Amino acid sequence: MARYIGPKCKLSRREGTDLFLKSGARALDSKCKAENVPGQHGQRRGRLSDYGLQLREKQKVRRIYGVLERQFRGYYQEASRRKGSTGENLLQLLECRLDNVVYRMGFGSTRSESRQLVSHKAITVNGQTVNIPSYQVKAGDVVAVREKSKNQLRIAQALELCGQRGRVEWVEVDLDKKAGTFKSAPARSDLSADINENLIVELYSK
């Protein structure tokens, strides 16, 4: 399945906000002006139609979590079948992805790096190696770095960065063991207010 491997800054500029696709605790640097669209001359973005706003919000969330369109639509369909708010269900499904949980626990400095750790069999769930980034982690699951991968420098650096930006409340991590417990799926109030999931629901409901 194809995946974008181009400049991360370009994606953030396209969405007009920092998507935190690059490692490090700081936001976009001065060379990546989020208010300008990608291109040699970086023209400022114009006003968008309602459809344009909905599309941009969907693209933004897709890129934050590193999910391709077909898979993202599948998450929406699953979210719509569940009880409660479709938008909140969608965000919870994305947050429960194994690659995202690895990122939230601080074992990877970005979701992309976390996805690579999972794909390279460096991560276990409840003691079993899982190499599927989209695997849905459940409340109470223990996610850990495999013993032979614990000495990787990038994991130590990622844990340090996570300590600087702060770890989310719905995971509990033992830094010495490089293992963590996924306590529960996050509530909507725990997630970024910069995401307007209702726009995505409106887009797919048409």
Curated annotation (Swiss-Prot):
| Record GO biological process | ribosomal small subunit biogenesis; translation
Specify whether Transmembrane helix is a keyword of the entry: no
Picking any one GO molecular function of the record gives: structural constituent of ribosome
UniProt-listed CDD domains: S4
Q: Does the keyword Acetylation feature in the UniProt annotation?
A: no
TM regions (residue ranges):
none
List, alphabetically, the SMART domains matched: Ribosomal_S4, S4
Q: Which family does it belong to?
A: Belongs to the universal ribosomal protein uS4 family.
**Name by which UniProt lists this protein:** Small ribosomal subunit protein uS4
